[in-house]
Amino acid sequence: MNSGYSANIFPSSSSPTLYQSHQLQPNPSATMYQATPRDMGKPPVRGKTSPYGFFVKMCYEEHKKKYPNENVQVTEISKKCSEKWKTMVDDEKRRFYELAQKDAERYQAEVSVAAYGGEDAMRKRKRAKKDPHAPKRALSAFFFYSQDKRPEIQAGHPDWKVGQVAQELGKMWKLVPQETKDMYEQKAQADKDRYADEMRNYKAEMQKMSGMDHYDDDNIHHVVHVEDINSQNIS
């Protein structure tokens, strides 16, 4: 990454220059997605990295690059990074906040997929749990938007995984004009009304068939879409 910024945070005897072009690698100190018993055996989701975390990572990598045979003094470098960070102005820190924002979007998309074991697992769960006679779940405005735009993204990026496509859709949704969002909100409201009507009829039929006095929503299996999870944080 060409940051266009350099700073000396080490003693003059070494004076390595920070932020020269190099590729970021996964942060080994980043927090990991906490797996539940259902998640066992799935690849963990790497946690979000803070702006300061990206800054410190660059300090370490640049020092290691310039002095590969030198034992890294963690305490000393951490101290120098902290001192330098406190003196940096907002313009100098902005790039690290941008990296953190992108990483947060990556994390959100990966957690959404991991929560359901990936796209294949979601399809299997849908086949296994959905009552074929139950009404189709109401879709969100973001989901309707995703239905329209996903083919374009997949055509332009055929190698992208489902998480990457979801992340791009989230970015696009944030930039959609309010007039366009209102159109999709109207679609979502109409679908919500349709679902409510169908669910009332469905419950009535189930009561007749089973002789139950009541039928709880907990007894009805719904299909949950990744886009619905993303839209909770995006809308």
Swiss-Prot record:
Record key words, sorted: DNA-binding, Nucleus, Repeat
GO biological process, one term: gonad development
Record InterPro entries: HMG_box_dom, HMG_box_dom_sf, HMGB
Ranges of the DNA-binding region feature: 47-117, 135-203
PROSITE patterns in the cross-refs: HMG_BOX_2 (PS50118)
UniProt subcellular location: Nucleus
Keyword Transmembrane helix belongs to the record: no
Main location per the UniProt record: nucleus
Gene3D superfamilies, per database record: High mobility group box domain
GO terms, molecular function: transcription cis-regulatory region binding
Ranges where the record places region Disordered: 1-47
Database matches in CDD domains: HMG-box_HMGB_rpt1
PANTHER family the record matches: HIGH MOBILITY GROUP PROTEIN B3, HIGH MOBILITY GROUP PROTEIN DSP1
Similarity annotation: Belongs to the HMGB family.
Protein name as annotated: High mobility group protein 1.2
Species in which this protein is naturally found: Caenorhabditis elegans
